[in-house]
């Protein structure tokens, strides 16, 4: 009997199973890859793009210029741990090949110029600034492109529409209707003015009949033409310049240069690939028809026709939901630093131009033209 008690049957023991333990269905992704990959893009491609945007920097007469070549980073002075201990920034020197070209004599001088110490990203996706570890947070911003929206006017209870052409870099172009059934344009968030003023200034159409043929004969177009103070291309350019740069003496050449620089200069205006894609899709272009990174005259015409179609209630014209994630994009650390670096470069560009005009051509060297303080200051502002 004792032996029977000791050898209890195995069926009496419970079979325990844990449902808390489940096998991994997928590997955990690298959650900081968006940070490290974006900064690697900036070091390899973003910096080169920023330098290309300002090349070449010419003097007033155009007989001398400065060009930027390859860039490279040196070795950091301290390791990440040493920077934390010494309360210093984890950074490396940036060197750029700069060429000075005298077009009159054909002389070319090339030097590798130190452009300042640049903060580096650690393997953890962070920056060490004065010994403190910091993270740059990505931004959720409006995607470049053209967007149409509507709202109710509080006084008249009319539906008014607006169109915003948002670039990745450059001036905004906005069209809007109002309770008086007028179509206005706002350039770079300045005072609004009749939209037909821009049509004439760009040379898209000049006479009343040409504008009606271009935009249609709706009541809105006719009312806007009646409010337009200009009747020729030259008058429109002067009017635009006076409203955009009040206090400065307007000339036709300066007005034309201003308008071209705002929307048609790749160095100052960039829709980016996503902006061009979204604009083409909204306005009915095919990629073969329009692949420009800047605005085109046809972009402006079709945008105006679209907002007129919305106001008239025509079929097939719909507004956009700007809060929809399809109309948003993530601006990562590499792009944020690139934008700040561009600000420093544009400040330095002015200094280089001034020095080219002041120094004797024989004495000019790339090192003597470049002042790195604006770039260093811009990067410090960011971090």
Language-model-derived ranges and their functions:
Residues 1-383:
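N-terminal non-catalytic structural scaffold regions of very large proteins
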């Amino acid at each position: 009997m004792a032996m029977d008690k000791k050898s209890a049957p195995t069926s009496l023991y419970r079979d325990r199973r844990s449902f808390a333990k489940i096998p991994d269905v997928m590997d955990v992704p690298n959650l900081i890859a968006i940070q490290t990959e974006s900064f690697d893009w900036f070091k390899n491609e973003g910096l080169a793009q920023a330098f290309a945007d300002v090349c070449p920097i010419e003097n007033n007469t155009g007989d001398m210029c400065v060009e930027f070549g390859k860039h490279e980073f040196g070795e950091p002075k301290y390791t990440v741990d040493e920077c934390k201990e010494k309360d210093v920034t984890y950074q490396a020197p940036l060197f750029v090949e700069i060429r000075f070209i005298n077009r009159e004599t054909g002389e070319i001088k090339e030097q590798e110029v130190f452009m300042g110490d640049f903060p580096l990203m650690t393997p953890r996706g962070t920056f060490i600034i004065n010994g403190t570890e910091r993270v740059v947070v990505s931004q959720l911003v409006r995607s470049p492109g053209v967007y149409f929206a509507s709202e109710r006017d509080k006084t008249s209870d009319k539906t008014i529409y607006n169109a915003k052409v948002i670039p990745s870099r450059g001036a905004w172009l906005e069209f809007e209707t109002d309770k008086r059934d007028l179509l206005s344009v706002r350039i770079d968030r300045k005072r609004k003015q009749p939209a037909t003023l821009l049509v004439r200034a760009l040379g898209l159409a000049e006479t009343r009949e040409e504008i009606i043929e271009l935009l249609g004969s709706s009541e809105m177009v006719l009312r806007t033409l009646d409010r337009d103070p200009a009747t020729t291309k030259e008058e429109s350019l002067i009017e635009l310049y006076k409203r955009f740069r009040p206090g400065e003496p307007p000339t036709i050449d300066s007005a034309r240069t201003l308008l071209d620089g705002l929307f048609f200069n790749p160095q100052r205006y960039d829709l980016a690939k996503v902006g061009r894609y979204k604009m083409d899709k909204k306005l009915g272009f095919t990629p073969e028809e329009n692949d420009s990174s800047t605005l085109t005259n046809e972009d402006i015409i079709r945008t105006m026709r679209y907002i007129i179609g919305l106001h008239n209630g025509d079929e097939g014209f719909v507004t956009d939901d700007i809060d929809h994630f399809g109309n948003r994009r993530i601006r990562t650390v590499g792009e944020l630093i690139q934008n700040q670096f561009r600000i420093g470069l544009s400040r330095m560009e002015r200094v280089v131009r001034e020095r080219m005009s002041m120094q004797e051509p024989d004495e000019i060297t790339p090192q003597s033209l470049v002042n790195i303080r604006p770039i260093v200051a811009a990067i410090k502002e960011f971090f």
